[in-house]
Curated annotation (Swiss-Prot):
Main function: Catalyzes the formation of the alpha-1,6-glucosidic linkages in glycogen by scission of a 1,4-alpha-linked oligosaccharide from growing alpha-1,4-glucan chains and the subsequent attachment of the oligosaccharide to the alpha-1,6 position.
Catalytic activity as recorded in UniProt: Transfers a segment of a (1->4)-alpha-D-glucan chain to a primary hydroxy group in a similar glucan chain
EC number: 2.4.1.18
Record HAMAP family: GlgB (MF_00685)
Protein name in the entry: 1,4-alpha-glucan branching enzyme GlgB
GO molecular function, one term: cation binding
Gene designation per UniProt: glgB
Gene Ontology biological process: glycogen biosynthetic process
C-alpha cells in the first residue's frame, strides 16, 4: 500500500501544509520491478479519475486526500491526465523533474541571472510537448509555498511547490494552465503564519484595487518597430526633447483616462506636431495607490492594468516607435511600499528590505529601502530593468530618487543611521548596485539611455563605470531648475539683485552630462503651475512662459517638459483629472503652443543646440554682467566648429530697448531665427528689425538689436 512508499512524517507534513518536497512521493513512484504507482494529493476530494493511455480509471482513496493508481512499469508524465474538480483535464504537476537548474541557482545567487524574468514568476512553457505554466518564487525562510488560484479553489494544500535544494527557490510546473490565469502565493512562515502574497516577478495583475497576479505570455505580441530598433542611437550627440507624461491624467474620454492603445495614437501624433523626440512616462509599473503617481511599486515586472493589458502596453511602445518617438520609463529601485500583500516581509522575514537602520521605514516616504547587499535582491532589480528593455523595447530608464540611494543619512537625523565601514555616509552597497545596473544595461542594450534624478554634487554621476563613475548617461540638473524657478518668481523690478540665479549653473554645467527638467515635481503639492509661479498680468505671464521655455531650449543640456507646460495650464497638475485641453481654444494658450512647436523644431534641426552640448567648447559667454537690464547673452557652437554659432539673448525685464548693443567681436553676418515676442506667438511684435553690425575701422566689434521685453532672441551668426 501507499504507506510503504510514503513515511508518516511526510504524510503529516503534507496534510498540515508544511511539506517542502512534495515531488519526493507524489507523481510517478516506482513501486516494484514490475509496476509503478501514481500518487495524488487532493484534499477534500472523495473521487479522482485518471485518464491513462486513453482509458479512464478510478484512483484508490487511502486517507486524508491521498489517492493512488497502479500503472505499468515505465509510466511517463505524458501517459496520463487527471480530471480536476474544476473540469480541467491535465497532466500531473508532480510527475515532472525540476526545471530550475544548478546554473539558474548559481547565477541568481551571484546576482547575475540577467534574464531572470524568463525563469522566475509564472512562465507559460512547453515541457516535453506538454503545455502549462511554470511557477517559480524565491522564499528562503518559508516552510511551505503553494500557488493558489481558481484552478484549485484558492486552496493552498492542493499545489505546494518543491523547494529546489538549499537555494531558497521553489518551483512547480502545472500543466493545462495558460495566459490569463489569476494566482497568488500562499506561504507558511518559519513561525507557522500563513501569508498570501502577489508575485514579485508577476508580469500582470488584476485591475487595482484588486491585487491578484496574472499569468502573462510576454512573447505573444508581434512587433513592428524593427526599423526603429535597428536605427536607435545613443543620443549623446543627438537632439533629446522629452515630453514627460502621466498616463492617467494626460487626456480623458467619457470621464476616464485613455487606454494604452488610444493613448498611443493620440500621443504619438501630438509629439510629432510639437517635435518632441521622446516621451517619459511616470511609473507605469504596477502600483496599488493612484496618489503615489506610480512611485510606490508592487509589480516591478508589470505594466499597470489600469489602462489595458500587457500586450496593449507593448502596442503603445510599438506605435510610438513606428511614429519616430522614443519611450523612457521612470523606474524606482530605491524604495518600495509596506503593503502586506507584496514585497514587505515576503516570506515572514525581511527579504527584499534593508534592516541597516534603526527604523527600517524611510522618513520621507514611509517605505522600505532595498537591501543592496543581497545578491538576489540586486538580481531582482536589475532583472526588472532588463525586462523593460528586452520585452517592452523601452529606450531609456530614469532612475528615481538616486540621492536617497547614495546616502545612508538621507532624510535621517544623527543616531538614526550607521556609517559605512570607512566612517562615511555613502551607501557603498547602493553605489555598487548602481554601477552594476548601468554596466549591464549599457552592455546588453548599448543604445539605451539611463538618467539619474540626483540633487547633490556627488561626483562622476555621468562618468563611465570604468572611469570610476556611476555610469549614467544623463543627470537631471535640479540645481538649474530650482535656480530658474527662484529667479522667475521675482518681480522683474527686483531681478537685478538675483542675477546670480541665472548664471550660477553655468559654472558647473559641464561637470556632468545634464538634462534640464521642468518636471512634474514642480507643479503639484501646492507649488502651483508654471503659469502660477510667474508674476504679472496675463500678457506678462505668457511672455514669461515663452521666455522660460526658450531659455531652457538655448541652455546647454537635454530638455524635459512636463505635460501641460507646453500650453501653460493654469491649474497645478492633478493625477485624478485630465489636462485642461479646452485652453487651446484660447489665443494666449494656442499661441504659446505654436511657439513651443517652433522652438522644438528649431532645436531638433540645428546641431548648435545639442552637438557636444555637455562640453565647455559648445558654450561661450557674450555678456553675463548686465544685471541692470536683466539680460544675458552667449554663443552656442556645434561641436568644435567655430566658423558659425547661435547667438542667444534672454531679456528678463519688462523694458523695451529700441537699440541694445552687444559687444561681440568678429561677427560678419547675423540672421534672426527666433523671436519669442513675435506676434504669431502672442507677443508684441518687437525685436524683428534687422540687426546692425557695429564696425570700427573695418573691424566688427558688436551688433545693435531691437530688444523686446521678456523675450528670447536667437540669431545665427558667422565669423
Amino acid at each position: 500500500m501507499v504507506e510503504r512508499i510514503i513515511n508518516s512524517e511526510d504524510i503529516s507534513l503534507l496534510i498540515s501544509g508544511r511539506q517542502s518536497n512534495p515531488h519526493k512521493f507524489l507523481g510517478i513512484i516506482s513501486e516494484s520491478s514490475s509496476q509503478d504507482r501514481i500518487i495524488l494529493f487532493r484534499p477534500g476530494a472523495h473521487f479522482v479519475a485518471i485518464e491513462l493511455q486513453g482509458n479512464i480509471a478510478q484512483a484508490t482513496h487511502h486517507h486524508s486526500g491521498i489517492f493512488s493508481l497502479v500503472t505499468p512499469k515505465g509510466t511517463l508524465p505524458h501517459d496520463y491526465r487527471i480530471y480536476h474538480q474544476n473540469g480541467l483535464l491535465a497532466h500531473d504537476p508532480y510527475a515532472f523533474s525540476p526545471l530550475w537548474g544548478e546554473m539558474d541557482s548559481f547565477l541568481f545567487h551571484q546576482g547575475t541571472h540577467y534574464k531572470i524574468y524568463e525563469r522566475m514568476g509564472a512562465i507559460p512553457c512547453d515541457v516535453g510537448g506538454i503545455l502549462g505554466v511554470l511557477f517559480v518564487v524565491w522564499a528562503p525562510h518559508a516552510q511551505r509555498v503553494s500557488v493558489v488560484g481558481d484552478f484549485n479553489y484558492w486552496n493552498g494544500l492542493v499545489n505546494p511547490l518543491r523547494k529546489v535544494s538549499d537555494s531558497g527557490v521553489w518551483e512547480l510546473f502545472i500543466p493545462g494552465l495558460d495566459e490569463g490565469t489569476l494566482y497568488k502565493w500562499e506561504l507558511v512562515t518559519a513561525s507557522g503564519e500563513v501569508l498570501i502574497k502577489t508575485d514579485p516577478y508577476g508580469k500582470g495583475f488584476d485591475i487595482p484595487p484588486q491585487v491578484t497576479s496574472r499569468v502573462i505570455n510576454s512573447d505573444r505580441y508581434t512587433w513592428h518597430d524593427q526599423k526603429w530598433m535597428e536605427n536607435r542611437k545613443n543620443t549623446k550627440d543627438q537632439p533629446l526633447a522629452i515630453y514627460e507624461v502621466h498616463v492617467g491624467s494626460w487626456q480623458w474620454d467619457n470621464g476616464r483616462p485613455l487606454g494604452y492603445r488610444e493613448l498611443a495614437k493620440r500621443l504619438a501624433q501630438y509629439c510629432k506636431e510639437l517635435h518632441y523626440t521622446h516621451v517619459e512616462l511616470l511609473p507605469i509599473t504596477e502600483h496599488p495607490l493612484n496618489e503615489s503617481w506610480g512611485y510606490q511599486v508592487t509589480g516591478y515586472y508589470a505594466p499597470t492594468w489600469r489602462y489595458g493589458s500587457f500586450q496593449d502596453f507593448q502596442f503603445f511602445v510599438d506605435h510610438l516607435h513606428c511614429e519616430g518617438i522614443g519611450v523612457i520609463l521612470d523606474w524606482v529601485p530605491g524604495h518600495f511600499p509596506t503593503d502586506s500583500f507584496a514585497l514587505a516581509s515576503f516570506d515572514g522575514e525581511a527579504l527584499y528590505e534593508s534592516v541597516d537602520h534603526k527604523d527600517p521605514l524611510h522618513p520621507h516616504w514611509h517605505t522600505y529601502t532595498f537591501d543592496y547587499r543581497c545578491s538576489e535582491v540586486v538580481n531582482f532589480l536589475i532583472g526588472s530593468a532588463l525586462f523593460w528593455l528586452d520585452k517592452m523595447h523601452i529606450d531609456g530608464l530614469r532612475v528615481d530618487a538616486v540621492t536617497s540611494m547614495l546616502y545612508l543619512d538621507y532624510g535621517r537625523k544623527a543616531g538614526e543611521w550607521s556609517p559605512n565601514i570607512y566612517g562615511g555616509n555613502e551607501n557603498l552597497d547602493a553605489i555598487e548596485f548602481i554601477k552594476h545596473f548601468n554596466s549591464v544595461v549599457h552592455r546588453e542594450f548599448p543604445a539605451v539611455l539611463t538618467f539619474a534624478e540626483e540633487s547633490t554634487d556627488f561626483p562622476k554621476v555621468t562618468e563611465s563605470v570604468d572611469s570610476g563613475g556611476l555610469g549614467f548617461d544623463y543627470k537631471w540638473n535640479l540645481g538649474w531648475m530650482h535656480d530658474t524657478f527662484r529667479y522667475i518668481k521675482v518681480d522683474p523690478i527686483f531681478r537685478s539683485y538675483h542675477h546670480n540665479d541665472l548664471t550660477f549653473s553655468l559654472w558647473y554645467a559641464f561637470n556632468e552630462r545634464y538634462l534640464l527638467p521642468l518636471s512634474h515635481d514642480e507643479v503639484v503639492h501646492g507649488k502651483g503651475s508654471l503659469l502660477q509661479k510667474i508674476p504679472g498680468d496675463t500678457w506678462t505671464k505668457f511672455a514669461h512662459m515663452r521666455l522660460l521655455l526658450s531659455y531652457q531650449i538655448c541652455q546647454p543640456g537635454k530638455k524635459l517638459v512636463f505635460m501641460g507646460g507646453e500650453f501653460a495650464q493654469w491649474k497645478e497638475w492633478s493625477p485624478d483629472n485630465s489636462l485642461d485641453w479646452h485652453l487651446l481654444d484660447n489665443p494666449y494658450h494656442a499661441s504659446l503652443h505654436k511657439c513651443v512647436a517652433k522652438m522644438n523644431a528649431l532645436y531638433c534641426e540645428l546641431p548648435y543646440f545639442w552637438k557636444g552640448d555637455h562640453k565647455q567648447e559648445s558654450f561661450l559667454w557674450v555678456d553675463f554682467k548686465d544685471t541692470k537690464n536683466n539680460v544675458i547673452s552667449y554663443y552656442r557652437f556645434s561641436g568644435e566648429d567655430r566658423s558659425s554659432a547661435l547667438l542667444c539673448i534672454h531679456h528678463f525685464s519688462s523694458e523695451y530697448f529700441p537699440s541694445y548693443v552687444l559687444h561681440c567681436q568678429g561677427i560678419k553676418t547675423c540672421e534672426l531665427l527666433f523671436n519669442s515676442d513675435d506676434i504669431s506667438f502672442g507677443g508684441s511684435g518687437k525685436g524683428n528689425r534687422l540687426p546692425i553690425l557695429c564696425v570700427d575701422h573695418n573691424i566688427p566689434w558688436g551688433i545693435a538689436i531691437e530688444l523686446p521685453p521678456l523675450a528670447t532672441l536667437i540669431f545665427q551668426v558667422s565669423f
